[in-house]
Amino acid sequence: MMTSVSNDRCRGAREKPQMPTAHAAQSQKQVVQATAEQMRLAQVIFDKNDSDFEAKVKQLMEVTGKNQDECIVALHDCNGDVNKAINILLEGNSDTTSWETVGGKKKNFGRESSENKENREKRTEREASRGRGTNNRKGRGGNRVREFKGEENGIDCSQGDKPAERGKRARGRGFGRGRGRGTGRFSAQSMGTFNPADYSESMSTDGCGTKLAVWEAAQNGTDEGPEGLAKSHSMSQEPPSKSSYGLKGAWKNSVEEWTTEDWTEDLSETKVFTASSAPAENHVTPGHSIDLVALLHKPAPPTQATEVNSFETSQQQGFGQALVFTNSQHNNQMAPGTANSTSASSYSPQSLSSVLGSGFGELPQSNMVNISNSQILDKLKPPGLSPFPAASSAQQNDTASPPATTAAWDLKPSAPQPSVLSRLDFKSQPEPSPVLSQLSQRQQHQTQAVSVPPPGLESFSSLAKPRESTAGDGPSTVSRLLQLPNMTVENIVSAHQPQPKHIKLPKRRVPPASKVPVSAVEMPGSSDVTGLNVQFGALEFGSEPSLSEFGSAASASENSNQIPISLYPKSLSEPLNASFPMTSAVQSSTYTTSVVTSSTLTSSALSSTSPVTTSSSYDQSSVHTRIAYQSSASPPDSAPGSVANGHGGGRSQHTVDTTSSVPAPKKTDPSALPSVSTLPGPASCTALLPSSAQHTATLPSLTPAAAELSSSPLSQLSSSLSGHQNSMTSAHATRSTSTPHTHASVESTASSAAFSAAATSAPSAPSSGVVLPGSMSTVSSLCLGGTTVSVPSSSTRATALVTSGKAPPNLPQGVPPLLHNQYLVGPGGLLPAYPIYGYDELQMLQSRLPMDYYGIPFAAPTALASRDGNLANNPYSGDVTKFGRGDSASPAPPTTPAQAQQSQSQTHHTAQQPFLNPGLPPGYSYTGLPYYTGVPSAFQYGPTMFVPPTSAKQHGVALSTPPTPFQQASGYGQHAYSTGYDDLTQGTAAGDYTKGGYGGSSQAPNKSTGSGPGKGVSVSSGTGLPDMTGSVYNKTQTFDKQGFHAGTPPPFSLPSALGSTGPLAPAAAPGYAPAPFLHIMPAHQQPHSQLLHHHLQQDAPSGSGQRSQPSSLQPKSQASKPTYGSAPYWTN
């Protein structure tokens, strides 16, 4: 909807701006002046610029790869704006529906009366000046568009200078039309115009969220009520909306980070915006808090009216509900600002309320985010949003680390916090356990989240500050926090259990959310989660009791956590502090996303883990651990958040929420947890609680180890984990093992979960890979607990990965877990380079690699012999038979012979014409180990294995040798055509074959000047290989070679690959021979260009440079036929 609408908007905006003016001015002339739409249709029907349009369409098709129809539609939707059309097509914002509905009639309806239009225009202007719709839509680029939109769409009607007229219009027309269009009109106009063009980041959210919220609310049947509300609160709401816009803008950016397209899709498909939009309406005067709440409630239209009408009640009830529902929806919108959102979710009532009340660091955004957090958490949880994983992570950070949120509150809302707290207290506190429970349960990390909120409730300001101090204080602050959380946890736990229903509600939102996280979340869910579930199931969560115990266990755990904090403060504390403070700072400002997402995440990741461990240490940590595990993707983000919050668990919880793609887990931490993470709270709780005690006991022992967590704690934790975690062990075991570690583990697990599927190392391995990152060294070992032990290093990278919250994408770099198996030698990294290359790639590389001593010489002997006329056959003749030169010295017959022979094959090799050199078989079999090509540097035949490509490569390699190119052409073309070879050999035959392209080329030396270039071209034209061939190529061979070798890499001129000495300068050849692997790797890793450049240099000089590759060929070729090699051929 959004997409189509947005396009509508885009086009409509353009057209409408024209039309409204025209209509307003010419309302009487409406008939006279065709609507913009009509005009457009007429143009479409009769296109004077048909050629232009076709050109545009072609351009679009080329750029976007879409089919003609799509491109045409996009072009029409974009009013012929190719760039916009490209953006729309690439962004997946198809205006197809919008475009269809954009008809002038609706616009006409919008402009039913010229008076209305005029009034509307005036109103729009007024409002714009007033800073209402248009100004609010500043971000959307909306003043100009907005005016027309408002006028045409009656969007501004609710605002209205003419409330009655406007209201009627807006309601009747705007809403009616909106409804008629399925709110598409408003959405389309508000969101559509800018959305496709991305006029402004916050446009869709702002326009859609706020404006649309109102309209949608009206459309939702709250037309008049919401409209009235909108009218009454419109102004007040709008400004908050604006703030929200700011948030949303930031959020949108975040979302873009989270894959805005996905979200757009989800929102559009899910019509989350509908609820979302209505909530915008709900942005009532209550202030940012209300805005947030309204936004939160937006997702839940039912609660919207209530919330708007009585935000307080709404907040209390709606908070749970709205948060729950809103969470889902806002998760979508707010995901970007998830960090805060999550944290709100975590301790949704308190955090949310406070955050909402406080307005977070950035009141609108933060508030929104916080609420969103819960919403997001809900959403994340049920859907197990992967896109939000980062957001989730961030959210989890928030959740996990109210401190982050609190920090933000501290920074900004500290003062407001008291009120927020009171507000929270009346809402969150009374509601908190319910709401928090709901949220918590939904969020799986509720316990943690709840724990956190209690501290937050206790005093968000103080909490925030303590949390901030937690970074430094860690233990003491954590103790407070943890202890509070323990109390809260217990309360929450009880409340927590009731909350499942809320979770379910979010589930309905799940589809959009889950849609995004499918890969990230599902992977853990499907592979790890299943295994984990089994494990955890076996593990016995004792979920319910566990949770209850969890609270008490949390105390012990928290103590342990405190210990870990102390420990971490030692090792992680610094990072923790750094990240923590950072988190606090971030929290205060960007905290939601940025902290969670990366800086905090990365730096926090380690510290996060420890903080997570610390704060997670309380049962929630375990409960959420599983959740975190599930949320794995999110967890990484959350981890930092957790750290920041000092509630590792919270963060983990967040992760859990994210992970808790299994909505059930969210609902029921205990039962769901097992299913969701299995690691989940129950497992953690049960095992953890008991283990918590154990951990408490163990942790003390571990505590020392904790400092060394990486190694000894790992074993210790492993031990505890073993008993404790069982299969859950690694990731979850770690988690359970020590609350702190558990959290680290959880965080790791969360990360792992994020990567979990990716990091298949083990159920825990995934966690280890990603999850460990948070814990990094300490937790990493811990988390690795077994599976992830290796992950620690990886884990570090994982941290970064986690930071992104999309571990899998990041995995490749730092996380071998996913990929190392792919590499021949994942860990070694040596062979892996080769595995990187395919046969073709190797061929390509080889062509670039300095020619082996044998590589070209082989080609030279045969090729030169046959090519005598063309290239200096002397070197090759000599080379083949003798090691006359260093270059040809290698009896390079094997490899180069393939090439040379192929060249000759072109020439005389027609008979010979084995794609593989005769020597190839031995080389072939030996070279069968192309990766060991370096080994047989002396082995002439080794390279031949790839000779067939070699000939191609040789062409490329012996770029200097016209034969090479021709060989290639002939080798490929003529090889295919036996006659071709003969023809090539004979200038005439070649001429016949290639029409002088090859013949000339083959005999290029003879006809090189005349034919060389042309031949090269001809060859390329006539033969597939000609690119490489022809004087043109020889001349350009440095590049062509690269290109060719890339295109048709010489098979394996193993000499190059082998590093045989060969055409490369003899000295270079030895160097290469010794480091063939290196060369191949460098060629591949570095661009092939370096090697290529080698060759290129070698080749490009044709004489000297070429010498390296065809070395003997080239120099001699130059010598023998300076014309061909030097002037004509190379010049050509």
From Swiss-Prot:
The modification Omega-N-methylarginine is found at R166. Pfam families: UBAP2-Lig. One of its GO terms (cellular component) is chromosome. Disulfide bonds: none annotated. InterPro entries: TC-DDR_regulator, UBA, UBA-like_sf, UBAP2/Lig. It is found in: Nucleus; Chromosome; Cytoplasm. Keywords: Chromosome, Cytoplasm, Methylation, Nucleus, Phosphoprotein. Residues 48-92 form the UBA domain. The modification Phosphoserine is found at S433, S440, S631. Residues 341-351, 436-448, 602-618, 631-644, 713-722, 897-914, 1101-1115 have a biased composition (Low complexity). Residues 168-182 have a biased composition (Basic residues). It comes from the Eukaryota. Residues 8-17, 109-130 have a biased composition (Basic and acidic residues). Residues 233-244, 331-340, 392-404, 619-630, 652-662, 723-742, 1116-1132 have a biased composition (Polar residues). Residues 1-29, 95-202, 221-248, 331-351, 380-479, 602-679, 713-749, 875-919, 996-1033, 1040-1059, 1087-1132 are annotated as: Disordered. Recruits the ubiquitination machinery to RNA polymerase II for polyubiquitination, removal and degradation, when the transcription-coupled nucleotide excision repair (TC-NER) machinery fails to resolve DNA damage. May promote the degradation of ANXA2. May interact with ANXA2. This is Ubiquitin-associated protein 2. It comes from Mus musculus (Mouse). The lineage of its organism: Eukaryota, Metazoa, Chordata, Craniata, Vertebrata. The gene is Ubap2.
